[in-house]
């Protein structure tokens, strides 16, 4: 259960920070004149922004007692956004899926399966001057995770298997500003909070010899404080690079799970790192007047270096 939840936490951090900052770039009205000079598109009549992000993520996590979780996953995020009338902001909808293969070799544990998620976004610039835009954005998320859990016995004489199902929900809130520097670069600091909730359905591993390992239905809740800063630079008419640094601090968790093993009831707190650091970078290229592509990297590292995550993303976006 901890492995499934950790995977969701890292996916949330990877996609949120990487996508943030792009939501406001919907049409010419929401861009400064400097940015329009360098992007060479974003027609003011374009009210819609759509993008697709296929991605690959690899991470490892030290779980204690010499156990290490290793995971490889790939997925795709698809989103579309539209500017609301009368400068009321930008409303968007997104959906995505992910396939993951995870292993804990010391426990001879395999977890394979899919995730599906969707949500809404809202972005609003509430004050602008010549070089600075102040904004806020909100994101909601619902998701469903299904993992086939297989426990192989010592000596590989057999295995026990079951299916874990987790329903997730959450919301994120950010406030920040985008400021243009003398070299036409843009710096964007943001602060905010994440709420992440999960409900796992009960499941059972029936072992050889009749031992029954039953996991009860469980609820988990996390609240994180988030701070990021992104620096974007236009190099020539079509190229732009971006680098982002961030930190995620867990300020609240309600994450106790219960296991019934034969006649024994065991309870344990879901142990996760309290502090995460995020490093991201990317390069974008304008294909046409109304479309661009970009390549991005996202690294996540936890306090005490117990978690190391690397994600690589390709992004295709168009305005219409």
Residues covered by each model-derived region:
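Short, well-structured alpha-helical interface segments that form or flank functional binding sites
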Residues: 166, 184, 222, 226
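Outer membrane beta-barrel translocator domains of Type V secretion systems
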Residues: 1-182, 298, 303-305, 309-317
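Secondary-structure transition into beta-strands, especially the periplasmic turns and strand N-termini
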Residues: 86-89, 126-134, 179-187, 232-243, ...
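Outer membrane beta-barrel transmembrane domains
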Residues: 119-123, 213-320
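Solvent-exposed, glycine/polar-rich loop segments of beta-barrel outer-membrane systems
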Residues: 64-71, 108-111, 146-165, 199-221, ...
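Solvent-exposed flexible segments
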Residues: 141, 192-200
